[in-house]
């Protein structure tokens, strides 16, 4: 905590010094018509130490089936993305190691289960990149294609997205329980249409309030579907009344928020470099609270500390209820609810681990930034990742 405070104070003083220097230099040049001042120092901010915040969560390392499942999933994904993605974009996908996130977040599943999670994540990331380049109207069309493919066995519009999703449904989805399958499809419907809403907001240049953003982001993250996958792979078919239990939902929402808040912190530089930073919690916090970038990052870090406490308290409450429960059916439901929360905890921690292994957020400096937590901003609108590049 002391080191974090010292680092934060140092960067605040540095920013103030840069501002004063810029003003003094500008006044001198205006009066004396001398050579222009040198370029300003790059803007930096310090990431919250989420690894420390999440150190109470389970850490089972990397799934031992990673290499085999990854090779299979990449070969499967390549069959569909080559028609849509150019050579540079295909290489970008490879360097992002999207399959690796599932090996950190589902360390307990067998090879077939891991392969299912990898295929699903390749679909999610593919949809995310495609809709990042689309208008709100086109993004809604992509959402409809995805949902119809998941729900309608005979639907096929010939697109790569449709055929990829159809293949996933036939290969994996049929093995999940009825309650889990129903929730998965409902969550997919909401998530993909929420992604289209995000595209509409980007078109209009609209930044939501903190409350409005958190509500939308819970859906655009797609994390609900990943939680459904966790239940399915642990052979859990949670009854709806247990799923709706207020205590369980407190733990569920806390885990959900922790995943996308970490993602927003780590992806901020990449998104602002593309000009897409309107859909990021740091932008939202800065706009509503008038905080600077560093203070906004600190604000989110404190929020994560509150949420991890909420998550742990919910889990403990359910464990106490289980210890007193005499009804076998209710006890079984409570046991599955607790197991589900443990699975979500793997997701929260594994997401952070993966974020510093992939080059998606920090490029070749990922290991350096993991150690220092100092992010240097890339110039805004300097990155253009075209799908066909």
Swiss-Prot record:
Keywords in alphabetical order, please: Lyase, Magnesium, Metal-binding, Signal
Q: Which Enzyme Commission number(s) are listed?
A: 4.2.3.88
Record-linked Gene3D superfamilies: Farnesyl Diphosphate Synthase
Give the signal peptide as a residue range, or say none if absent: 1-15
Biological process terms from the Gene Ontology for this record are: isoprenoid biosynthetic process
Q: Where along the chain is (2E,6E)-farnesyl diphosphate bound?
A: 360-361
Residues at which Mg(2+) 2 binds: 128
- The broad enzyme category this protein falls into is lyase
- Cofactor names: Mg(2+)
| Reaction catalyzed | (2E,6E)-farnesyl diphosphate = viridiflorene + diphosphate
Binding of Mg(2+) 1, residues: 128
Instruction: Mention any Pfam family matching this sequence.
Output: Terpene_syn_C_2
- Give start-end ranges for motif DDXXD motif: 128-132
What is a GO molecular function of this protein? metal ion binding
State the family named in the UniProt similarity comment for this chain. Belongs to the terpene synthase family.
State what this protein does. Terpene cyclase that catalyzes the cyclization of farnesyl diphosphate (FPP) to viridiflorene.
Free-text comment about domains: The DDXXD motif is important for the catalytic activity, presumably through binding to Mg(2+).
Q: What is this protein called?
A: viridiflorene synthase Agr2
- Native organism is Cyclocybe aegerita
From the broadest rank down, the organism's phylogenetic lineage runs:
Eukaryota, Fungi, Dikarya, Basidiomycota, Agaricomycotina
Which gene underlies this protein? Answer: Agr2
